[in-house]
Amino acid sequence: QRIPGKKKVLFSDPGFPIQKSQLRIIGAEWEEFDIFSYRGAALSDKLESILAKGDIAAIIYSNPNNPAWICLEEEELAIIGRLSTKYDVVVIEDLAYFCMDFRTPFGKPFEPPYPPTAARYTNNYILMLSSSKIFSYAGQRIAMICVGEELFNRHFPALEQRYNDSGIFGQSLVASILYMITSGCTVSTQYAYAQMLKLSSDGAIDFVEDTR
């Protein structure tokens, strides 16, 4: 919807199959490839061959992913970031298993090593953080999205025309899309999730160690 002609989502599999089911419900198209066969530098040629067609609106992947538990390396994330900027594609990172590559001691707030993310290499990103695995808080069905500031504030005429709003990406996403298609959750759940995030940020709890 941001850019006319960009009508497909590209999945780097394996990922969360429900995401494809959601696209099926709304009639959206997608392409997919298995990341196992395109690790490292090989990912560049594969992505370029798909993105160069000009019809991909977003790339989505889980990192780490389930069930293969493949963890993308910095080289691969840099490739994704570079090409998403080149072809104006939004990177959607599903971080349900945030910091859970236990080979590296992630989880210490504001201290290296920092969790890997394509957000280091592009401004076109949305990070999705579900509480289900991070805090084992699955029953309440709450999550958070983090939109890159440049993308959030970017104006798209197609969004303005479609939703009769400002056409600012972040405003359209929140007020004209998410508000309409999500059921929301109770205030108590929102406060609980916010408090768990704060305690983690303050270093009072170590959710990575708790989930190990």
Where are these regions (language model features)?
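Substrate-binding/gating loop at the entrance of the active-site cleft, primarily
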Residues: F11-A28
